Amino acid sequence: MTQRYHTPLFVLLLFFLPILSYYPALASDILLDDYQEGIRRNWKEKSFKGSTQYEVVQEDGRRCIKATSNASASALYYEIDFDPREYPFLVWRWKVSNILAKGDEFKKEGDDYAARVYVVFPSALFWRTKAVNYIWANKLPQGQAVPNPFTSNACMIAVQSGPSHVGQWLDEKRNLLEDYRKCFGEDPPKAGAVAIMTDTDNTGEQAVAWYGPVRLLYK
């Protein structure tokens, strides 16, 4: 049987980003969603192979999105136009049930993650669209960054790695502006979307992740 690999999400998002649904107008921090009324309509789902189940739940007293993947790959993305120079910091909380035994950041057949949060930087020239992926890595050491095995236009940054903190809520804060510069050696254009994704289609495994509210912090 031929192994199917999902196309990197940030490329497909080009078809959904010509008209952005939200533009931050005031100089203040941006909370994408607090999940108090379910998942807002600003979030859209893109399926690649099967569908990861995304639902709002109460987990450890926190409202969050629970993602359940069983050999599937789909993502939730939130269209938002913002300048990383004005909103350089990305903040979120997450928790995973497990990492993926067959997951490998260097191989196409291992390009699955129990959890990832990423930012898409669209371009009118599709081959110039880029993405910064913050991953809960399977093998890549924490703090390291590598190109996605499908394309060098997607940078994979291991914010967490391995099983040490499985089952624990972790708070993350990343300097998106600096991460983009380190990944691609240049200043970023405006961003067009923030996405969350739990995918296991390439490895055929299972994973559950919980995502707390995502915020963009004003400089």
Where are these regions (language model features)?
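Extracellular/lumenal carbohydrate-interaction signature centered on repeated Trp-anchored short motifs
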Residues: E79-L90, P163-V166
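Extracellular beta-strand elements of beta-rich domains used
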Residues: Y35, V194, P213-L216
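Extracellular/luminal beta-rich ligand-recognition
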Residues: G110-C155
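Extracellular carbohydrate-recognition regions
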Residues: L26-S47
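Short carbohydrate-recognition loop motifs
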Residues: E55-A75
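Bacterial N-terminal signal peptides
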Residues: F10-S21
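Solvent-exposed strand-to-loop "edge" motifs in beta-rich extracellular domains
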Residues: R93-I99, P122, L177
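Extracellular beta-strand ligand-recognition surfaces/modules
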Residues: D112-V117, S152-G162, V166-V208
